[in-house]
Amino acid sequence: MQASFTPVACWDSADLPKGLLNDSSPQTPWSVEQVVASLPGGPPQSNSSSPVPFFHMLERLKTTKREGWRRGESISDHMYRMALITMFAPPSLSSRLNIPHCTKMALVHDMAEALVGDITPVDGVSKPEKNRRESTTMDYFTQSLLSKVNNGMTGAELRAVWQEYEDSETLESKFVHDVDKIELVLQMVEYERVEEKRLDLGEFSWVASNISLQEVKDWADELLKEREEFWGGVEHKKFDKV
C-alpha cells in the first residue's frame, strides 16, 4: 500500500522558509494539566521520590508517532537512531565534541513531545506557542515528576540538556541539530526504497541544505547521491538548495 505524507510535516520549524508557520493561536490554550488529566489511568503521581511515575510518562514517547507518514516511526524510534548516530562522528569532529553529552542530548531533545506531540508547521501552531508548550512540559517533568528524585538533580540535568539543544549555541547542540536532519533524510530515503519508486518524498530533501557542520554535510551528500542512484532515470523531485 502506498504511504501518505505531508510535505512539511517532519521539518524543524526553525529551518522552514518564513511564512510557512502559522501565527494563529488555539481558542482554548493548550496546557500540560489538560493533557495529563486526559491520560489513561489519570495523572502520574507528582512529587514522588521514585522515578517510576516518570518512567511511565516515557511510554508515550514509544507510542506517539512522528507526523508526516502513515505508519510513521515513533518519537523514541527517531531519538534512538539519533543517539547511535552521534557515536559515529568522524575524528575531525569527535575530537572537538563531548560525544556522551551529544548522545544524551539526542535522547532528550524531543522528550516534551510525550505530552505536546509532534507539532508540525501544518498544525497552525506558532513557534512561540510551540516553544511555550514544550518548555512548560519540561518544567512539569522536572518540577512535578522528578523534583524529589535524587534531590531533583537528575530532572534539572535533563532540563538543562534540553534547553541547551533548544538554544543551539554550543557545538554539541549544533551537531545534534544536524543529526536530527540527517535522521530525517535517512528516513525519507528508506521510505522511498520500501515503496519501490511508487512514492517520491523529494520535498523533504531540502532539509539537508540547513546542515551546518561539514562532516554531517558529507553524510547528507552521500545519502542524496544514494537517492539519485536509486531513482536512476525515473523522473523524481530532486534536491535543490534554498
Question: What is each model feature region?
Answer:
Residues 1-242:
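Alpha-helical, largely C-terminal catalytic domains
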